[in-house]
């Protein structure tokens, strides 16, 4: 198991993340975090651990720098999707990950940035899983999302259910909307986050393919 803190740079920005690669991984999942969250998110780290046990590598990354973490940037989907693409390009170049099929896991506003990134990507992405996502924030890109997309929403998260139902109708590829009974937006109820991890693992393993 490789466990490493990595730094991803371009001419203007430096991002920091956790790269974890189990032996003989089936693929790698890039986590696109939601508002006010990052690589230390306990919920996303829980999901990542379950993916590791299922033979999937992960990259959890802070999409915003410390200087950028003021409130308006957490809803700047254009900026966040650019960072998802920046991290994806790094994965496509790193010798440890470039041969791995790439998928995205997005939470809250991070789901919107992942969906927009897929629609804009010049490389292959195998699948997307959204946990309590806000795909409505990337509405104009949804018809261009043709990769298999799983939308997971808590059964008690009523406003977000409606947003995901509307987004589901707009998505341009294979898709599934799953409501997890008894779960609220953060999936804090016993057993609900375990269901998220289980469904995500199954979806990724089902749809992983060699990148273009």
Predicted regions and their residues:
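Catalytic active-site module of serine/aspartate enzymes centered on a nucleophile-bearing elbow/loop
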Residues: 191-212
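Serine-hydrolase catalytic machinery in alpha/beta-hydrolase-like enzymes
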Residues: 6-100, 186-191, 195-196
